[in-house]
């Protein structure tokens, strides 16, 4: 719930700056692009409302989808950043199979691909306690890791703004 609140604040700020925002959800056995890059605050909030929580965490699939969207945005002259908000460890691999070890390797592979493309961003851990492995993932991406246990939406929003300010 707090992650959704933080995203709503970020959307309002992005709208004020006339930035484009895209939403990628990763759950179950894969990732879905809920919304391609848009400036529509109403449409983005509507899609955000459809975002379910819980279940498997196909983190690598989410990172792959975010990377693909970022590359498309770059091709259109935009300067994309990736803000990953999650409260879970990768437990579904790129093939959609529940395999924690392979899922972690796949997530690192995608993190290195994001780093290789020179994309900025950050990893925000929204869990009640720091989630083991997300700091390693951020290191692989060469982006900040922000563990925000029990943080409210404004704290998450401020952290994202600070980390992405130079993007």
Model regions: which residues?
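Short beta-strand-loop
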Residues: 19-50, 70-73, 95-98, 130-140, ...
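VWA/integrin I-like adhesion module and closely mimicked acidic/polar interface patches used
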Residues: 88-140, 146
